[in-house]
Regions:
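Short, conserved active-site loop motifs that form the nucleotide-linked donor/cofactor pocket
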Residues: 8, 86, 118, 145, ...
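Short acidic loop-to-helix transition motifs that present clustered carboxylates
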Residues: 32, 126-129, 218-222
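Gly-rich Lys/Arg/Thr-decorated short loops/hinges at beta-loop-alpha junctions or inter-strand turns
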Residues: 16-24, 48-53, 88-91, 113-114, ...
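Non-transmembrane, aqueous-exposed alpha-helical and coiled segments at domain scale
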Residues: 14, 23-76, 80, 93-113, ...
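Generic long, charged, amphipathic alpha-helical segments
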Residues: 196, 201-223
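Active-site phosphate/pyrophosphate-binding segments
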Residues: 82, 95-195
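Generic beta-strand/beta-sheet core signal
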Residues: 27-29, 53-54, 89-91, 121-123, ...
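Single conserved hydrophobic/aromatic residue that forms the stacking wall/gate
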Residues: 1-12
């Protein structure tokens, strides 16, 4: 807060700043997903060699920018032959935040997918997310990238990567299960994102050794 009132005296934080220390300005700007995503889309269009990322506070909030997503991000290349490499980070998952703070509406984005118009991903490891962003800027062409990013994975003890996982390799569209002997596996489960860690925990707790769990990291184009 700029002005503190919950004390004996009101405190204005810049009252001790002298004239030769520069200017300090506070603006109560409009909270508009539509406006900011529109600006970032234009910025990405004007600077195709920059990695422009727009992150929603929660994935649900992207509905405030639906016009930009429907008319530009998903369709501009087909309609106007305009490529754009903007990245959308959409927090997604039932993680105790309540209504309108839980779902990035994965199904809506998949319904917009056609003719390789954009990338849609749901990464499960830090290194794979790194390589996905790296691939986005290293490609010789530009496509929008939609990434679902559960907040619970930020501090999950199992969601870690070794240094060599960042320095070596590339983005993996599919991650195989190396914890199960393929000769013993009787069932194969395909999943994506944070579901892997839920399934992995259950498998470990129940000591199941005949179920393999394969992660699909890129949802579109499907590997």
């Amino acid at each position: 807060h700029f002005v503190r009132r919950r004390q004996r005296q009101m405190c204005i934080r810049d009252s001790k700043i002298s004239d030769n220390q520069g200017k300090f300005r506070i603006y109560n700007s409009l909270l508009s997903e539509y406006g900011v995503l529109g600006f970032d889309y234009g910025y990405s269009m004007a600077t195709p060699n920059s990695l422009t990322i727009w992150e929603a506070q929660f994935g649900d909030f992207s509905n405030g920018a639906q016009i930009m997503i429907d008319q530009y991000i998903s369709a501009a290349e087909d309609k106007w032959k305009l490529q754009n490499g903007i990245v959308l980070l959409l927090p997604h998952g039932y993680e105790g935040q309540g209504a309108e703070h839980s779902s990035a509406r994965v199904e809506r984005y998949l319904q917009l997918c056609a003719k390789d118009n954009m990338f849609v991903a749901n990464c499960s490891t830090p290194s794979n997310l790194f390589h996905l962003l790296r691939r986005q800027i290293k490609l010789s062409y530009r496509k929008p990238l939609i990434i679902f990013t559960p907040k619970s994975l930020l501090r999950h003890p199992h969601v870690v990567s070794k240094v060599k996982d960042f320095t070596d390799g590339n983005f993996k569209m599919v991650i195989d299960d190396f914890n199960i002997d393929c000769k013993q596996a009787k069932k194969l489960v395909f999943c994506s994102g944070k579901f892997y860690y839920d399934l992995y925990t259950v498998r470990e707790n129940r000591k199941i050794d005949d179920v393999a769990i394969v992660r699909i990291e890129q949802l579109f184009p499907l590997p």
